[in-house]
Amino acid sequence: PYSGFKNFNTPSSIAQDLVDTGFNFVNGANNHALDQGEQGVSNHIHTWNKFKDQVLFTGVYESEQAHRQIPIKTIKGVKVALLSYTFGTNDHQPTHDYTVDTFDENKIKQDVKKAKQQSDVVLVSAHWGNEGKHQPNATQKKYAQIFADAGVDVVLGTHPHVIQPVKWVDGREGNRTLVAYSLGNFLNGQSTGDESNDLLGRIDFKISKKDKQFQVQDVKWRRDRKST
């Protein structure tokens, strides 16, 4: 029988399929980011660089200079920053501190501050939580509050493989942050548990400008169920 924790490796050709599907943001910061080592990270980055005019790829880096930059994409005149963080990379350790963005409170605050200076809206892709659990754990709630206090507009969570709640979290400056703790799986279910029944959580929202400030409004939450 197979043993050990699974290592993932996906053909680079799938990138074109994701672009054709309509994705324009991709987060490389997750617990499998180093499954294929530094070469895998390099391949990942160079694959998405081919689509840089269509997709903003973030979360893993080949240099400190690239790591310091705030990833921003302009959509219909709105500058959207995407910050990405993961709880870890399983048993794999990066050669450099800048390779993968992991959860660090001080760095998050610095990143968000820079992002707010350079963009209109700040999104965070957070790879966190416990697999198969429908409720956020204490660490997720802790960082959701950190994101809100820093002024993040929207947090999109991944990793649990099942849908978790969507909440507004109040920040210390009177702002509100929309937090989707876990969107479930977009394409594949799992072989155990009820993941295959909770295929995808979808959030629709509008970004509007009021009094020179951009706001997240008209939030609609939908969960799509996979037929069995």
Which residues fall in each region the model found?
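Acidic, metal/ion-coordinating pockets
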Residues: P1-S227
